[in-house]
Amino acid sequence: MKAILTSLLIFIATLFISQATFAQERTTDRVWASPNASVAQTIGLTEIYLTYGRPSVNEREIFGGLVPFGEVWRTGANEATAIVFSDDVLIEGELVPEGTYSLYTIPGQNEWTIIINNKLSWGTQYDEAEDFLRVTVQSKESFHMEQMMIYFENVTDQDGHLVIHWDTTRVPVHIQLAD
């Protein structure tokens, strides 16, 4: 019980810290064209929380057009996508300690590089030196998703897939509990 309470307190503190960081960086109270969204998922006793902007297709060519292949993308709109882990996890088999990170990607035609970056920022100041982890995953063709969405699927008490889905591309990323 004590371990659960400690993890919960760390998670809540991390959320407040990350929200305070974003609040300090925002310089306007205007409504964004791409609305902000968040998703939270529990895997076992581990909480995973993301905040991101949801851009729309709006009849544009997305991957290979608006979002070029082979270039770092902040994985959303408005600001960098933030991801918080209440406990250590494995992303595609690689250890990521509990904490708050930025999620960047490098889209490709058939595979994407998933980047876990130590620095929380607006998203335009990406610093490769702050990368904690880079893994490669396969992208899949899927049904059309007008607004970008990040969600979880195939969740068990040990693992699940974080999915980045926009236009007709979906990118599943395996996340499992660390021992």
Map each language-model feature to its residues.
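Bacterial Sec-dependent N-terminal signal peptides
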Residues: 1-25
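A cross-taxa feature marking solvent-exposed loop/turn segments within ectodomains of secreted
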Residues: 16, 96, 107-109, 143, ...
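Primarily secretory-pathway and cell-envelope proteins
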Residues: 24-68, 123-179
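Mid-length scaffold segments of soluble, non-membrane domains
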Residues: 73-122
